Amino acid sequence: MGEILGIARFRFDEGKLDEYKRLSAEAMEIVKTKDTGTLQYDTYLNDDESECVIIERYRDSEALMEHAANLEDLSAEILAIVTVVHGEVLGDPSAELRAALADSEIPQLFTPYASM
């Protein structure tokens, strides 16, 4: 077990960019003040601001699960105004994280194959 990476890509529903930006700012504040194992949490917008990519890095599976719990209510609000294009979790997850992801198509889990 070790670091876990997350990649999420959203397309904003029509007219929802400003609401997303407000919710994203709230999420960032929660991450900064409540998460204890989040190492990276970055949001990128494409040129026309119709989509975003979020890059997340966690100390371990427990940290990702803590993050998900901290953002649970806010995540529901965000998911109500976006279409999920894709989501991936990369790493060697704990049994608990693997179980939490088991019934979900998104995010898709990728485990290590080769790295340097």
What are these regions (language model features)?
Residues 73-75:
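A generic local structural motif
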